[in-house]
């Protein structure tokens, strides 16, 4: 069985679920899951878990994301990106200095509050926001805390036809809406704005350079070399602390045993996780602090081997 993380270069126009469906079809396996929705109009890095790796999906969705975005200042849209209808227009009469733009971007770095857009999959009252939006209903959305680790302009500001546009790169926490960020940058500069282009260039330490397209996946599937192009579970979890155990403990982990907590993890909070490695170098499980028993750790996820392995 195929196990590992496929780094897919998602094309524009496809949903994340479309990608999962196509990967299942190409690889003839049902055990496929993506690690977080990427809007249809956005291309770029979409890690897809296959086989045993589907058990670690939740640990990959939390990784920070890197985007290359373009903002157009001068009008805003219903969807906050280039696909929506214009809702507000205010022509830019004079060029905006790059110093002013850079100063505005700098104000967004750090932990900030963001209100999710109406055209998004965020659920309120058991219903997705885009479902309300399609009915022409706008509802109040609570703001959410996000982190902008880095944001900087990457191209000169282009002034033409009453608009100013430029590209920027942003490294941000999960759940950040870059189109909303573009709108807020415009507001900071005194104009309506929208995101006119977006590509995800990184997810955690996975980069666009490592990704393959669906067409390339078809080719390597026919060649029988899919395994060579997958990220092993062990590397996919390298953002977690590592606990290397001996053979005695390994047999206990295989059975989901509760284990004494090593001193190095004594500081763990309830939400912290550690990747447990067998002497062979295989990641066997993900452990967590026991919620009720002091100085003990329990399995959060057991990554069983396939029967044929």
Swiss-Prot record:
Coiled coil: none
Keywords noted in UniProt: Isomerase, tRNA processing
Keyword Transmembrane helix: no
Catalysed reactions, semicolon-separated: uridine(55) in tRNA = pseudouridine(55) in tRNA
Isomerase is among the record's keywords: yes
SUPFAM superfamilies: Pseudouridine synthase (SSF55120)
Top-rank EC class of the record's enzyme: isomerase
EC number(s) given by UniProt: 5.4.99.25
Active site: 39
InterPro entries for this protein: PsdUridine_synth_cat_dom_sf, PsdUridine_synth_N, tRNA_psdUridine_synth_TruB, TruB_C
GO biological process: mRNA pseudouridine synthesis; tRNA pseudouridine synthesis
GO MF annotations, alphabetized: RNA binding; tRNA pseudouridine(55) synthase activity
PANTHER family noted in UniProt: PSEUDOURIDYLATE SYNTHASE TRUB1, TRNA-PSEUDOURIDINE SYNTHASE
Similarity section: Belongs to the pseudouridine synthase TruB family. Type 1 subfamily.
Function of the molecule: Responsible for synthesis of pseudouridine from uracil-55 in the psi GC loop of transfer RNAs.
Name of the protein this chain belongs to: tRNA pseudouridine synthase B
Native species: Bacillus pumilus (strain SAFR-032)
